[in-house]
């Protein structure tokens, strides 16, 4: 009751009139009901009702009982673009019982198992996104109001970033008012592409923040006449958007990280536990791709061969191999510092709740089985021929959604991390792949219409 009264006072102080009870569907898309602030008690005790059959991947039919979204008071987030409204991340219940098809609830289940093993999973996610415009015929282009963001290598370029600074400052100020600790923002490697970095925290809070970040970018971008997209690869000749994951485990009692060890014989400053966790991630990497790169479009980003230099900037900045190394951005997993890993495969469109649940389960399997990731790769993976890659025994990441889903179906650890969501996810993704195969693209028409 004390927490309830405290949030009631905060709502009054912030002049909040409306609440959003918000959860995500299987794709990670935010779903909400808006209720007046006077309904706070009902949102805590019962929740806002939803017909689950209207939501992707909710495991319900039109005959099913309502899903009720009960708000998590610790997730209180005023909307910077709508000051009289606040969002609460929510967990789903059906008939008074916690509903396992809820991605947030599922992540909490997995994190509870991690805590029981003595650890806290701490994560930083780096969301890249594009600002685009869309013409009446449906074609898109990078948002470029001053026609200056046209360089082949626009990364970090002042003139390319300048037109977007008002948008980026608006977004950064909004997030920092919420206590996120945004510490840097930059123009990324593609025209109209940006990255915002905010503080490390526990995995559940990070997933809540990434979800809200997507909500915020979509609304703030509208003020500037742009569409914010978290699609992995909106342009064939531009670098794709990732959601790079920085991760480590901390001791549940002390809060101290357990991945750092300066006596590391491999020279990366990592502990035995860190290497076992890493071994688990690499062991399950191909199945993880289905969850962390969950759309057809994601595999235009995780591509092999000549595609490595097909981007205007000359590089994809995206790995295609199951590998780890030192501070080396051609690897799947980069060791950014002692005990500090970054996974570069994760795509911007990842559902963070499902992605992080699968990810930590893979790592914990590595700890349980004491898996060894082998020696780090210290060279430029982009410079190696496919023959060299194959000869070294290095696995290649899935090159299509279908291939990734095949790997997921065979991987009990990753499937178990998704719980009952796994079968629903696999079914939907197979349908997505079949729908994609049935499409006739503009490229096919251009290539073959008068070819014969």
Annotate the PLM regions:
Residues 1-452:
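Glycine-rich, acidic/polar active-site loops that bind/position phosphate-bearing ligands
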